[in-house]
């Protein structure tokens, strides 16, 4: 049986704006239940919404970042459905005229680079949150703090073909929104949520069939996304063989995902567009966006995005795939690296140092690069001292830790503790000759092929110089002298 997966993702990003989408209530996570509400987000009679300008500008910025076409006229619609945490009985959203359309981003997987097309990005408000308590009275409570929070929904075309591609796409989107400072994109606190639409396109005897679409709701981790896709792929193949149900005959249904069992569970048959009874919101007028305003947002707020940054870093500095992926996980880490690289002749060595020693300190202290007080130029300077033989690689790590603790440069510590490595050839040669004269037995062992003899003599050289001679140069001179005896 020949088939391919058709996967489209609907991603909800809660924007990190100061206030909610259509009222002045503070937009924040958590807090005392129902402490950040007003007549507008509670849907009380006579309360009139007004559009948060930052919601519109954030949507425009997201459109630029995803290569989308941005509309000049903004229209809001009412999406009607009944649910306890939706106080108005409808959600303010956008139906047939989303602010952004026909965009795309690139992802990279084990199969290479791929373009994923984005059907639309639209603005809407979030619902409240239902809290189901495990108690004898079997009651549920509703917190409306989240009601009216500003959301962008990004809907991809069904261009994704595997769980790996789905996770890569989600990662790419999350990186974009974080780079633009639009959202924390935390799945833990609900500011980055994902629904998966999945079915199979099956070819039998040159005839194509589509299996029913499963929309898997509220997946709470990238791991769950991949597991749900893998399970649905297997399930839909099996159901096709047994029942041969098609999209035309069955349609679309809504599924949940059981993390513990690793299976999808039917929740309900999917509503159609007509079930939501979309109408234009009469309380919100059309908004005209001038082309200059749209372009101004791009020129003032757009930054280099992760995919482009990775290409540039590889071309400019010769970094590996691993290096650039790790560095671009945080735009501030990229900035730190490039500032450090300015003071060194070997940018790749600087990258290695940051990705090992600096990140180790950040992880140990549970801080980000913005909270790391050591100037980037100090790292480049330290790496340069290692490269030119001023200090050894071993002592450099001790120096670095003291630099971090004291927030001083490496040269300060080197001068204070007289740690500069000795690279004077004539001096090292005199020490080597001295060690050879004192250890004739070690010379005999070396001639018999005993490699430990060299290690012993190197140890004697380091002991006589308190470990301050250049070990590479010392070893080179020692080996040359051993050839002559």
Curated annotation (Swiss-Prot):
Keywords: ATP-binding, Ligase, Nucleotide-binding, Protein biosynthesis. InterPro entries: Asn/Gln-tRNA_amidoTrfase_suB/E, Asn/Gln-tRNA_Trfase_suB/E_cat, Asn/Gln_amidotransferase, Asn/Gln_tRNA_amidoTrase-B-like, GatB, GatB_Yqey_C_2, Gln-tRNA_amidoTrfase_suB_CS, Gln_synth/guanido_kin_cat_dom. It is an enzyme of class 6 (ligase). Disulfide bonds: none annotated. GO terms for molecular function: asparaginyl-tRNA synthase (glutamine-hydrolyzing) activity; ATP binding; glutaminyl-tRNA synthase (glutamine-hydrolyzing) activity. GO terms for biological process: glutaminyl-tRNAGln biosynthesis via transamidation; translation. The keyword ATP-binding applies. Heterotrimer of A, B and C subunits. Belongs to the GatB/GatE family. GatB subfamily. Allows the formation of correctly charged Asn-tRNA(Asn) or Gln-tRNA(Gln) through the transamidation of misacylated Asp-tRNA(Asn) or Glu-tRNA(Gln) in organisms which lack either or both of asparaginyl-tRNA or glutaminyl-tRNA synthetases. The reaction takes place in the presence of glutamine and ATP through an activated phospho-Asp-tRNA(Asn) or phospho-Glu-tRNA(Gln). This is Aspartyl/glutamyl-tRNA(Asn/Gln) amidotransferase subunit B. The gene is gatB.
């Amino acid at each position: 049986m020949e088939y391919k997966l058709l996967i489209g993702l609907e991603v909800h990003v809660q924007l990190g704006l100061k206030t909610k989408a259509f009222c002045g209530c503070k937009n924040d996570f958590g807090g005392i239940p129902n402490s950040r509400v007003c007549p507008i987000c509670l849907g009380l009679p006579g309360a009139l919404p007004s559009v948060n300008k930052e919601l519109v500008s954030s949507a425009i910025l997201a459109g630029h970042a995803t290569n989308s076409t941005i509309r000049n006229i903004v229209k809001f619609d009412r999406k009607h459905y009944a649910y306890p945490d939706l106080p108005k009985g409808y959600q303010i959203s956008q139906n047939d005229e989303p602010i952004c359309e026909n965009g795309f981003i690139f992802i990279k997987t084990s199969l290479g680079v791929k373009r994923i097309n984005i059907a639309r990005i639209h603005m809407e408000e979030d619902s409240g949150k239902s809290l189901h308590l495990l108690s004898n009275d079997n009651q549920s409570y509703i917190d409306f703090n989240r009601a009216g929070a500003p959301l962008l929904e990004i809907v991809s075309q069904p261009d994704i073909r595997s769980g790996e591609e789905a996770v890569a796409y989600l990662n790419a989107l999350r990186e974009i929104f974080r780079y633009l400072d639009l959202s924390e994109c935390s799945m833990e606190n609900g500011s980055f949520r994902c629904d998966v639409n999945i079915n199979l396109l099956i070819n039998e005897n040159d005839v194509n069939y589509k299996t029913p679409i499963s929309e898997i709701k509220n997946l709470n981790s990238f791991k769950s996304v991949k597991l749900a896709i893998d399970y649905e792929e297997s399930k839909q193949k099996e159901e096709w063989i047994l029942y041969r149900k098609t999209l035309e005959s069955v349609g679309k249904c809504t599924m949940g995902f059981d993390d513990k069992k690793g299976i999808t569970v039917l929740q309900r048959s999917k509503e159609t567009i007509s079930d939501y009874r979309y109408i234009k919101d009469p309380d919100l007028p059309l908004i005209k966006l001038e082309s200059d305003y749209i372009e101004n947002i791009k020129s003032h707020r757009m930054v280099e995005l992760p995919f482009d940054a990775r290409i540039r870093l590889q071309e400019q500095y010769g970094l590996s795939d691993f290096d650039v992926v790790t560095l671009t996980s945080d735009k501030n880490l990229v900035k730190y690296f490039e500032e450090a690289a300015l003071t060194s002749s070997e940018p790749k060595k600087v990258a290695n140092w940051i990705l090992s020693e600096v990140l180790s300190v950040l992880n140990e202290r549970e801080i980000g690069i913005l909270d790391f007080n050591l100037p980037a130029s100090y790292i480049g300077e330290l790496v340069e001292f290692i490269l030119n033989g001023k200090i050894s690689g071993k002592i450099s790590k001790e120096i670095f830790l003291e630099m971090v603790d004291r927030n001083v440069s490496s040269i300060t510590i080197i001068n204070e503790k007289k740690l500069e490595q000795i690279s004077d050839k004539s001096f090292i040669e005199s020490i080597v000759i001295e060690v050879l004269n004192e250890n004739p037995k070690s010379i005999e062992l070396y001639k018999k092929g005993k490699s430990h003899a060299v290690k012993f003599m190197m140890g004697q050289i380091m002991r006589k110089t308190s470990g301050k001679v250049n070990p590479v140069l010392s070893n080179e001179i020692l080996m040359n002298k051993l050839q002559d005896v």
